[in-house]
Each structure stands twice: as structure tokens, then as C-alpha cells.
Amino acid sequence: MLHTQVPEEEGVELRRTADGKGDGVLATRSFAAGETVLVGFLVGPLTGNDSHATQMGPGRWARHGGLGPKVNHSCDPNCGVRLNDGQAFDIVARQPIGAGQELTFDYAMRNFTIDHFPAVCLCGAARCRGSVTGWKDLPATRKANYGELVAPYLRTMDDEIRRALTEGGR
């Protein structure tokens, strides 16, 4: 059994998931809604997008260190992301999380488009979209439900697209 604990990431550990889908980050203690579960940090910029890249803005990607990249996707996640002072994304609880629960976030919370995942989503959530998609493909209700726990540039891009459509329709 894979079992890794990083001192800076107390309260979580990397393990095999109970559903047999592979590795996941699980809580080893309870977290309250709004609590930072993992503090994000960057290990370097990237020249393009890949399956472990984090989109930092239009045409910009970086690689996160620690256990953050090991947090799995869910179409109905218990976590979201918040940009920190180091320009990395913290993983933040969207709801109470109990010890033993797997941490998940929607990869669309920090990627406008996603082109590097399998066509079929394996999250198993009741609200599963069927595929891992980017922010641009989310319905407005889902975007609103995520509140502020998404990459800020995504909201800016939505505003720019709306503005362009409004100006183009005049």
C-alpha cells in the first residue's frame, strides 16, 4: 500500500483509494467548510499544457509541488481552489470533510479547457458530467455553485467573453 505523509501537509495523506481507481489524497482528520486543506506551492513554469499542469491564466501553465497534484477530480467535489500569495492554488474544503474521506476538486475550477484526459470521467458522482471538461464547458449554475473557490482568471475570461458577445451583437 502506497502511504506518504509530507510534514507540511498535516491532516492528509496519499493512499490507494477505496474504490480501486488508484492513488488519492485522503483526510486524516476533519476539516471545516472554508478551511485550507493543502497549501499550494509551485515548482516551476511550463511551456504548455499536460495532464499535471495547472493553468495559471490564458496561455500560462505551471507545475504544483507536494500532494496538490495528486488530488483527484470529481464532478461534485468536496474541495475548491483559492489563489494564494505565492501565486499557487490552495485546496480549500467546500463542505465539512471527515477523516478518511478522499479530497476531490473539479479540474474545471482551474482550467479553462481540458484536452488531456480520457473521454470518460470515472469520478462516480451522482452529478457526474460524463467527461472531465474545462471551465468553458460548465453550465452557469455549476459555475455559480462553485462561488469564489475557482481560479480568478476563469471569471475574468467569462466576463471578457460576455463583453465581446455583447459588443459583437450591437
What are these regions (language model features)?
Residues 1-170:
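Conserved catalytic SET/PR domain of SAM-dependent protein methyltransferases, capturing the structural core
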